[in-house]
Each structure stands twice: as C-alpha cells, then as structure tokens.
Regions:
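Acidic, proline/glycine-enriched N-terminal capping motif
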Residues: 1-142
Length: 142
C-alpha cells in the first residue's frame, strides 16, 4: 500500500482520476511470464496515482459504496472501469480493501474528461439506502 502515514479517516472521499484502461486491456499474456500488467495499465497506475495523491484524500475504513461517473466521451463500457479504480484506491490506502465495497453505482457524465470517484463509508450497522446519482462540483475536488 502506498498510503501516506497518518491518512485521516473520513466518511466520504471524492476525487477525479484519468479514465482507466478497459478491464480488457489491464493484463497481457505471453513471453513465458503468464498474466502480467500491460504497459498501458502500468502507465495509468503511475499517472492516476500521482493525480490521486495530489488531491490528498482521506481514508474510508470498512464497508463502503463506490460511485463512478465516467465521461460520456470515453469509448469503453463504464463497467469496465471498476477494477482499475478499485485497485488504485486500495493501493493508495483510500480504502482498506476493495472487497469492502458493498455496492457500486456507475453512470455517465458530460462535465469533464475525468472519472469522478466517490467512496462513501457505511457506518456500523448502517442500512443501504437508495443512492441518488452524484456529480460532484469540480471545486470540491480541486
């Protein structure tokens, strides 16, 4: 995990990230190595990681709901963005474990060219309520 020490615990995090490669392009096979991260995926992990850290997100411990708003200009199916984004959030300590996601909400947006990612923690015993789509104001994550 690449989380800076002392990342503050918060109830919710919203960040903007570059559009990830499609899940179909994350791994490659061959060269006698078995499955391995593609060059495109490695480049995205590096660039998106720097973008994430620059926004100084807190940490959402325990179970959470993941909301992804993918730009309509993206050429991939929006459900192909979940794995890369979830893995990045775990790698950088925004979530403890991406298996703690109890729900994912995906939607298209036309506001900008990045993926708007919101992680909402579920407090102990909190019921899952219907969630309205969220389009965060850009100034909230700048």
């Amino acid at each position: 995990m690449l989380a800076p020490p002392g990342r503050r615990v918060v109830d919710s995090v919203t960040v903007l990230l570059p559009v990830p490669p499609s899940v179909n392009a994350l791994y490659r096979h061959g060269g006698g190595k078995g499955p391995h991260k593609s060059d495109v995926y490695r480049a995205w992990i590096d660039g998106a990681g720097w973008r994430l850290q620059a926004q100084r997100p807190g940490r959402v411990p325990g179970p959470y709901v993941l909301l992804l708003a993918v730009p309509r200009t993206s050429r991939m199916d929006h459900d192909n963005s979940v794995k890369a984004v979830s893995d990045l959030l775990q790698r950088h300590g925004v979530v403890d474990n991406d298996r703690n996601a109890v729900r994912a909400l995906l939607e298209w947006h036309a506001e900008h060219d990045e993926v708007a990612v919101t992680v909402r923690g579920l407090s102990d015993g909190a019921a899952l309520e219907p969630i309205a789509p969220v389009r965060p104001p850009l100034e909230a994550v700048a």
